[in-house]
Amino acid sequence: MSLQDQTYRRWNVMQPEPGTPGTPGAPEEPEEEKEERAELDTRMLYKKLEKYFYDTRSIHLWGIVDDKSAKDVVTKLLLLEADKPGEEIKFFLSSPGGSVTSGMVIYDTMRLIKSPVSTICMGLAASMGSILLSAGEKGRRFIYPHGEVMIHQPSLGGHIQGVSADMEIHAEQILRTKEMGARILAENTGQTIERIRKDFERDYWMDAEKAVEYGIVDKVINKLY
């Protein structure tokens, strides 16, 4: 085969098929196919991210604490614990708080597994989020330089209507929940329970440095890995 023929064949192999989307003169790709391809690309990206997070033993909570997010976090905690018991798990969170019940499922799981859980506040850890942040392994609780923490007592979550007996039950439950939160934070931060109860009376905000002083976290993070 002559050099000219070889060059011609190599050139043809390198060229895309006529009509391939994205080539000059090709017909416009239908909008529906574009959307399907974009959705497929997104799914593939999420799979890659999930594999990366699994390989690095990282869990993320971004948003409110509810049954759905708690199920996701707890499932991953148990999966990583089963995979390599006793090896560190990194828990990144940015949350305004949410359901106390759902949050306590995460909290208890963190405390019951053998693997130490490092907590990293990426932006905001408020309400239930602050309790989860404080629950990390002592010495391994971190916050981003511009992260914020807010603690406060639990609320009834709106206007409560009903007979007085029901309202008394709600009030008693709030008091029990408040006391539980104060006890947990006192244990995790080293603050007195009286100080926590006092700070619970209003929204108590802390920047990164103040969160370290308070004992919610141990260090302001300066690099991820």
Where are the model-predicted features located?
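N-terminal organellar transit peptides
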Residues: 1-128, 135-225
